[in-house]
Structures are given as structure tokens and as C-alpha cells.
Amino acid sequence: MSDSKSDGQFYSVQVADSTFTVLKRYQQLKPIGSGAQGIVCAAFDTVLGINVAVKKLSRPFQNQTHAKRAYRELVLLKCVNHKNIISLLNVFTPQKTLEEFQDVYLVMELMDANLCQVIHMELDHERMSYLLYQMLCGIKHLHSAGIIHRDLKPSNIVVKSDCTLKILDFGLARTACTNFMMTPYVVTRYYRAPEVILGMGYKENVDIWSVGCIMAEMVLHKVLFPGRDYIDQWNKVIEQLGTPSAEFMKKLQPTVRNYVENRPKYPGIKFEELFPDWIFPSESERDKIKTSQARDLLSKMLVIDPDKRISVDEALRHPYITVWYDPAEAEAPPPQIYDAQLEEREHAIEEWKELIYKEVMDWEERSKNGVKDQPSDAAVSSKATPSQSSSINDISSMSTEHTLASDTDSSLDASTGPLEGCR
């Protein structure tokens, strides 16, 4: 919009402690979530005639970390196009020049709930396996673009009442680092893999550990490894899964290895005891077979040593998951990331600001030319789920509240209720 941008295109509304200055096309703003990265409102898009989520990035230029994350999120959202990853519908700023530039608004699909609201419900095998399949498809698509998430958790995965699932964000930047001995919990890290906790190198199946933790929580209705900090979480991991082998210990940095080797030794608990038959659905002989398959999948995902952990492709072909396999979803063409140095870029804050401003202006220019002024197919409709049975086509009744909030489990509006129909 640059020079043609006028104050008359925008209006301001107070949302909690923040002022949203948005395009007039977005009406009926209602706060639905907040976190370290921003505040999210549900709104009605009067141009497209659909409900959307409007996210205001919180102080994107307060430091280099925030600025880099904002740039990374914007670039990736513009490039990624997959039914199991949230769609970006619009990007704008009310400021007219680079010098004034302070606020970034992202407009995305509006979903019905995040996984926190579904994960403790009584899900049958059909629903559970379909949700996991979609997670794996979304993860594989990110991996195909060289994006390894490393921070998957229920609060950044969203669902609709028809059981469709989407990943909200793109996780930790490759340059993000952690200090095993010193890092406290700033956000939920119950789902982070041992190699992230221990400061090791990692590969794509780092995200499989997170899926395993999420699946375990679906089954147990409680967090599997609820550590107070990284050290406490590591202790909870080895208490349940057992102390890893000497071969694994050799892969650790000396200071970390010294700590880990001096912990008490644990034999681990059998998966049949961690996940006994009675906690799974068991209404039929078929359920009993699926229970055995589900437990086998858990045992292959929740493996401390990443070299022995199942891969994303292997998980998609596992008997518990493969019933849903569709090449169009699981083998979708990779997104073309146009910034090859995205993960490695380091800039001063003002340089990040200019890069982000250029991305916003690029979007606005393309929108004026008609490139981006239509909703994505995923935003207004979704392909029927593979099953035609009513049990999977309805995670209903969904709350009438909606969500698109990712940073913390507590970010959801308290009025957003569980999905009653799945109980």
C-alpha cells in the first residue's frame, strides 16, 4: 500500500492490554489467545466472507531474537502450502513508512480448538490415528523444505470439528541454543527430544519424539514427562524409559555426559506397563489389534537414542497409521523457500526491520495485483476425511470458540471449552 495507504483504511480497537489497528475489512475482533510471540483475535473478514484469526506480533523489533523469529515466521508462512499447516491469508501493517514501521499483523485460518482441548478426551483408535497421521504429513512437508521443528506441542497444533489438523508454527530456529544445566522453563518443553535437552546434534526424527509424547498424552490423559526444568525432565525420561546405553553416552558433550553418567541407573518400565491394555479403547477385537499397534508405534517413537528411533517415513507406513496414507498428502511437493540463508541469517535489529518491512510490502503489492486476495482452499473448505464413517467425520460438538494461539498452553481464552462430542 505504501504511498496509497491511508488512515481511513484502518480502525483501532482495544484488545486486553493491546491496541489492534487493523484494516476495516476485519470486523468483530474478539481475543482468543496470547503468548510470547503475539496476541490473537478472531475476526470476520467482510471481503472474503469468512472467519479468520488476526495475530499481532508482540514487539517484533524489541531484540534480534524476536526480529529473527518474526522474519522467519513470515517467510515460511508465505512459502508453505499444505493442508496440515496453517494457511496465511493476509499480512499488513498500519504504518506508512519504514521509519514508522512497528507493527506486523498476520491473518490466518481460524480453527476450532487447539490440541490441548482434545488431547484429554476419550479418543477412539480411528480418531487418534487420523490426528497422528495428519501431524506426520505436516511434519514431513516441513522437513522436505529443510525445516526441522524441534518444538512440537499440543498448543501449537490446531484442529477443526471434522477432525482436520494443522500445525501452527515452525518451531525453533536452527540457530537457537539451549544450555542443559542452566535453562529453566520459559515455555512448555515437555515434548522436546533428548537430543534437544542434552544439546546434541539432531536430525529430522527429533520431531518424532514430540509426536510420541503427544500420542502418549492422548492415551494417558496426562503429560508423560512433566519436568520442572531440563534436568528434572531428563530424570523423568530415564526413570520411565531406562538409562541409555554407553554407546549413546559417547555422543554427549563431556560436561553433559559427566552429569548424565552420574545419575542413578534405571532399568526402565516395559511399554506394556506404561501403556496397559485397559487405557486404550477396547470395545471390539479390532480395537485389541489396534491397541497392540498403537503401543508398538509408541515404543518406536519414544526411543532416547535418535539413531534407533523411527523416522517420519517409517511412522507414516506403520500399521497403526498407514490406513490413512494418501500420496497427495504424505508426498506433497516441497515448498520453495526463496531465502536460502533463512536459518543462518544474523542481522542488527534495524536490518531485520527492513527485511520484514520488505516482506510485508511485497505481500501488499501482490495483493493489489490480485495474487493473494483469495482464501486458500483449506481456509474455506477441506477434503473429506479418508473415512466415511460418522465416528471420524465428527469430533463434534466443537466449542463455538475458535483458536489460533501457540506459545503456551495457558494462552487460550478460558471460555473455550472442550469438544463435548468426543467424550
Curated annotation (Swiss-Prot):
Give EC number(s), comma-separated. 2.7.11.24
Q: Which GO molecular function annotations are given, in alphabetical order?
A: ATP binding; JUN kinase activity; protein kinase activity; protein serine kinase activity; protein serine/threonine kinase activity; protein serine/threonine/tyrosine kinase activity
A GO cellular-component term linked to this record = Schaffer collateral - CA1 synapse
Record-linked InterPro entries: Kinase-like_dom_sf, MAP_kinase, MAP_kinase_CS, MAPK_JNK, Prot_kinase_dom, Ser/Thr_kinase_AS
Q: In which tissues is it expressed?
A: All four isoforms are widely distributed in brain. Isoforms alpha-1 and alpha-2 are predominantly expressed in hippocampus, cerebral cortex, caudate-putamen, amygdala and the granule layer of the cerebellum. Alpha-1 is more abundant than alpha-2 in the periaqueductal region and the substantia nigra.
Its main localization is cytoplasm
Catalysed reaction(s) here are:
L-seryl-[protein] + ATP = O-phospho-L-seryl-[protein] + ADP + H(+); L-threonyl-[protein] + ATP = O-phospho-L-threonyl-[protein] + ADP + H(+)
Question: What does the protein in this record do?
Answer: Serine/threonine-protein kinase involved in various processes such as cell proliferation, differentiation, migration, transformation and programmed cell death. Extracellular stimuli such as pro-inflammatory cytokines or physical stress stimulate the stress-activated protein kinase/c-Jun N-terminal kinase (SAP/JNK) signaling pathway. In this cascade, two dual specificity kinases MAP2K4/MKK4 and MAP2K7/MKK7 phosphorylate and activate MAPK9/JNK2.
Family per similarity comment: Belongs to the protein kinase superfamily. CMGC Ser/Thr protein kinase family. MAP kinase subfamily.
Recorded protein name is Mitogen-activated protein kinase 9
